[in-house]
Regions:
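Glycine- and acidic-residue-biased ligand/ion/polar-headgroup-sensing regions
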Residues: 63-66, 73-93
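Bacterial N-terminal signal peptides that target proteins for export
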Residues: 1-8
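Short beta-strand His + acidic residue motifs that chelate non-heme Fe in jelly-roll/DSBH
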Residues: 68-70, 88-89, 110, 115-121
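Bacterial N-terminal signal peptides
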Residues: 8-17
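Short acidic-glycine-tyrosine-enriched beta hairpin
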Residues: 49-51, 63, 86, 92-113
Length: 148
């Protein structure tokens, strides 16, 4: 009887690992980032919907030298750097000397309504999680790409 139980457990583990492997092979669907971000950014939705109520996770591909001018969100924003370099600064104007750079695997949480800006070095892939609806409000209206 113990042999049958062991064989059953092994079979269950094999089926589970096959299903997991299939789920991880799903290709992300990349498209342009929302118009609230400067041009050049690409976005893929991992889960949820940033425009709807509830949790969501997205990935952003950002070109080298990309800058998101000072802005804020009504909710906490959680970022995990996957590749490249991403830097964050706080305040209503960009100060490159004040930027704190993340390395791949590092994370940052930007509190709701905190004014911050983002810069990249090299092609950058970052995962962003928050609760929607997620909005971007620029500290300086002239920086808003939707108004150009």
């Amino acid at each position: 009887m113990p042999t049958r139980a062991i064989l059953f457990a092994v079979a269950v583990l094999m089926v589970t690992s096959t299903a997991t492997a299939r789920a991880q092979k799903t290709e992300l669907k990349w498209g342009p980032a929302p118009p609230s971000l400067p041009s050049g950014a690409r976005m893929a939705v991992i889960s949820g919907n940033p425009a709807a109520p509830g949790p969501f996770t997205i990935r952003l591909r950002l070109p080298s030298g990309f800058t998101v001018p000072p802005h804020f969100h009504p909710v906490d924003e959680h970022q995990t750097l996957i590749s490249g370099r991403i830097g964050h600064g706080m305040g209503d104007r960009v100060d490159v000397r004040a930027v704190k750079w993340l390395r791949p695997g590092q994370s940052i949480t930007l509190p709701a309504n905190s004014h911050h800006y983002v810069k990249t070095r090299g092609r950058t892939l970052v995962e962003v999680s928050a609760v929607g609806p997620f909005t971007v409000t620029y500290a300086n209206a002239k920086d808003d790409p939707r108004k150009r």
